[in-house]
């Protein structure tokens, strides 16, 4: 297949607030990323986690540029992704709070177990856990894309915690209405 190059057009001027409002309509599951071991534990909330490749199985996480999590995950060589359930908004807020304590103190009072491979906390009640080997990190504008090679994944039943229009929602997943093909 041959594709012709599209001429580059001048950027359209648009109010940044309007673009931001439009982006708020991208609903996404909320996860807490963790790395360990216990003496170097760290967690952070992320709402942009996606499948990048099925073979090899790679997931991507978008973080703020200069994120300490990306640096720590690279140094440890492994990390975990905890996909939060609809009743775990408090966990998401805890790890999104920049004034939270460092290290294991940020996990105080939270039920978790250390993964035997990653030594990272797997948060109890999460809908899914992806244990990853660090693959790479890439600068992407004002963000950083962290890629992980999934070495183990587990899933449970329940509704997801979703980020939508700037808020957190306990996901109510209704099947879309089907219409007859015309």
What does each model-identified segment do?
Residues 2-182:
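Basic, polyanion-binding surface patches
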């Amino acid at each position: 297949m041959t594709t012709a190059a599209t001429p580059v057009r001048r950027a359209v001027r648009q109010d940044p607030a309007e673009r931001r409002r439009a982006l708020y309509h991208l609903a996404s599951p909320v996860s807490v990323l963790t790395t360990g071991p216990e003496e170097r534990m760290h967690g952070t909330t992320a709402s942009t986690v996606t499948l990048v490749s099925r073979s090899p199985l790679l997931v991507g996480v978008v973080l703020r540029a200069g994120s300490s999590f990306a640096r720590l995950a690279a140094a440890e060589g492994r990390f975990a992704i905890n996909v939060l359930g609809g009743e775990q908004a408090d966990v998401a807020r805890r790890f999104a709070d920049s004034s939270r304590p460092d290290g294991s103190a940020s996990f105080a009072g939270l039920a978790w177990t250390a993964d035997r491979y990653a030594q990272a906390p797997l948060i109890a009640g999460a809908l899914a856990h992806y244990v990853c080997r660090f693959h790479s990190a890439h600068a992407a504008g004002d963000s950083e894309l962290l890629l992980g090679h999934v070495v183990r994944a587990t899933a449970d039943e329940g509704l997801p915690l979703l980020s939508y229009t700037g808020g957190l929602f306990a996901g109510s997943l209704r099947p879309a209405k089907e219409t007859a093909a015309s």
